[in-house]
């Protein structure tokens, strides 16, 4: 029997391939960043062909570093940035436009027109999501409306849509030569086009958006064999057997299998998911109802999700745009030069505000500035913004679910930052727990694939493999915590109502 499972993690800033052994331990990794394309304010794009090239490269890197042959890989799992929309020609295999990324806000007018008098809640009862620029459906409509010949080609049946999971899978399984056009329930649940009850495309909503259903991939479970890597591929013949959107994959990798268990992933943005079991919980507090996972023929499991647009990308912005730091980890040392935020609060509403506000008219603000404030204070305010936004989402989860969390499992790149993790525990008032394998997104996809082919026996193996690495316990006085949180909420209100007729994006 093969000894390893390989996960492809097609993320917002990079693509990675990670090889895991049976204990869930990382054996080798390959990683390559792709270009972030900003054609206009509020627009964010990726080149799908660059992504596909990078995926092949990182698979080769991982196999080489592990000295592992394809014959020793039991299965391949795919996890991906969700919502990001790719539209391509089924005959040529070429994208008709760049991928429109989940952070992109160009579809605001489309969203407002679709909502009409019913507003953002128009489809929420059916799809679990508010009408927002975040989701795939309006992005597909924008491409069909704005790329010459795209709508006609789509109506002829010549175009295919997918998030990057589908794009990678289609290419891996042969592309124009019989590529499998499939997505899983978790990714489909982020398009605004899938009915949460039936787990099938909703033709009425697709028609409202002018999207031919023929473009849409077949919806399958998160753990089953979808196809095999093409003959000329580095993993020729290896089954591709797991697909989970990145945040659902992290939830799976964190072994959040019981109702009320939650995790928070700290990446480009932050995403907190709470398992709600086989019952959908409709949010009254600005959260999303989404599919958490579906293992083969087992019933689907749902989740509440709080999505935060900008957290880690704020640190990248300080590095790349303002040149305040030269590498992202330097933010911690800069923050340690001061004891607090000096009264400064940084609300990074670069793409509007996601949960729990859903304010597309908001834009970033740095408030509370005096001549006392230094770069150290701004660095600390940037880190604290991540913790404050997560606290607001956790409050909403408590209100919707009636569950009081006793601890929060965390993962993602920013959990290496000790200053942030301690402040997160302080502001939440609960323990924050980091697992030994922090790459839970890739791990979750690996588990889904491995379970499908019998490499792992099921959720119990995931639970048995999970191990705690570090725990942060709240240390802040409650009065201080409440004062800081009140000031944060005041700062958030200063970002509202910025985008109007005088401001395009």
Swiss-Prot record:
Record: residues binding ATP: 12-14, 268, 312, 316, 413
Residues annotated as binding sn-glycerol 3-phosphate: 12, 82-83, 134, 246
Pathway note: Polyol metabolism; glycerol degradation via glycerol kinase pathway; sn-glycerol 3-phosphate from glycerol: step 1/1
Any one cellular-component term (Gene Ontology): cytosol
EC number assigned by the record: 2.7.1.30
Protein's UniProt keywords contain Kinase: yes
UniProt-listed InterPro entries: ATPase_NBD, Carb_kinase_FGGY, Carb_kinase_FGGY_CS, FGGY_C, FGGY_N, Glycerol_kin
Residues the entry annotates as binding glycerol: 82-83, 134, 246-247
Pfam families: FGGY_C, FGGY_N
Catalysed reactions, as listed in the record: glycerol + ATP = sn-glycerol 3-phosphate + ADP + H(+)
Example of a GO MF term: glycerol kinase activity
Xref: Gene3D superfamilies: 3.30.420.40
Activity regulation: Inhibited by fructose 1,6-bisphosphate (FBP).
Keyword annotations: ATP-binding, Glycerol metabolism, Kinase, Nucleotide-binding, Transferase
Entry keyword annotation includes Plastid: no
Top class in the EC scheme: transferase
GO process annotations (BP): glycerol catabolic process; glycerol metabolic process; glycerol-3-phosphate metabolic process
Residues that hold ADP according to the record: 12, 16, 268, 312, 413, 417
HAMAP family in UniProt: Glycerol_kin
Function of the molecule: Key enzyme in the regulation of glycerol uptake and metabolism. Catalyzes the phosphorylation of glycerol to yield sn-glycerol 3-phosphate.
Family listed: Belongs to the FGGY kinase family.
Protein's UniProt name: Glycerol kinase
């Amino acid at each position: 029997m093969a000894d390893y499972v390989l996960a492809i993690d097609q993320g917002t800033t990079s693509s990675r391939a990670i090889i895991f052994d049976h204990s869930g331990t990382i054996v080798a990794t390959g990683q390559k960043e792709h270009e972030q394309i900003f054609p206009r304010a509020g627009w964010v794009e990726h080149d799908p062909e660059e992504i596909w090239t990078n995926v092949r490269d990182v698979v080769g890197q991982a196999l080489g570093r592990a000295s592992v042959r394809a014959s020793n890989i039991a299965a391949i799992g795919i996890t991906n940035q969700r919502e990001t929309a790719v539209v391509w020609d089924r005959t040529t295999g070429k994208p008709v436009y760049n991928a429109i990324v989940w952070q992109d806000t160009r579809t605001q007018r489309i969203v407002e027109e679709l909502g009409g008098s019913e507003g953002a809640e128009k489809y929420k009862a059916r799809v679990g999501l508010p009408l927002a620029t975040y989701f795939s459906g309006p992005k597909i409509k924008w491409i069909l409306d704005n790329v010459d010949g795209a709508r006609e080609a789509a109506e002829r049946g010549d175009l295919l849509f997918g998030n990057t999971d589908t794009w990678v899978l289609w290419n891996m399984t042969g592309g124009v030569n019989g590529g499998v056009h499939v997505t899983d329930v978790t990714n489909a649940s982020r398009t605004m086009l899938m009915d949460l009850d039936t787990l099938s495309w909703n033709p009425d909503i697709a028609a409202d958006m002018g999207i031919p259903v023929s473009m849409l991939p077949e919806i399958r479970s998160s753990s089953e064999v979808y196809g095999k890597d093409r003959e000329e591929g580095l993993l020729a013949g290896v089954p591709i057997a797991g697909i989970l959107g990145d945040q659902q994959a992290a939830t799976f990798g964190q072994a959040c299998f019981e109702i009320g268990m939650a995790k928070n992933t700290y990446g480009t943005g932050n995403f907190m998911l709470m398992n709600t079991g086989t019952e959908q919980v409709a949010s009254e507090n600005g959260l999303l109802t989404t599919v958490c996972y579906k293992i083969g023929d087992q019933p689907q499991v749902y989740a509440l999700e709080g999505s935060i647009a900008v957290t880690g990308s704020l640190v990248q912005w300080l590095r790349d745009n303002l040149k305040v730091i030269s590498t992202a980890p330097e933010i911690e040392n800069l923050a340690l030069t001061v004891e607090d935020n000096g009264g400064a609060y940084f609300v990074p509403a670069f793409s509007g505000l996601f949960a729990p506000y859903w304010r597309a008219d908001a834009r970033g603000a740095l408030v509370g500035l005096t001549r006392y404030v230094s770069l150290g204070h701004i660095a600390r305010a940037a880190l604290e913004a991540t913790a404050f936004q997560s606290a607001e989402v956790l409050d909403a989860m408590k209100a919707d679910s009636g569950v009081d969390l006793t601890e929060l499992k965390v993962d993602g790149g920013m959990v290496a930052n000790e200053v942030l993790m301690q402040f997160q525990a302080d502001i939440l008032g609960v323990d924050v727990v980091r697992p030994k394998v922090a790459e839970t997104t890739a791990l979750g996809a690996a588990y889904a694939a491995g379970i499908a082919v019998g490499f792992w026996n099921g959720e119990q193996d995931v639970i048995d493999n999970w191990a705690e690495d570090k725990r942060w316990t709240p240390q802040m006085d409650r009065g201080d915590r409440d004062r800081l949180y009140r000031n944060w909420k005041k700062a958030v209100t200063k970002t509202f109502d910025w985008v109007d007729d005088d401001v395009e994006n």
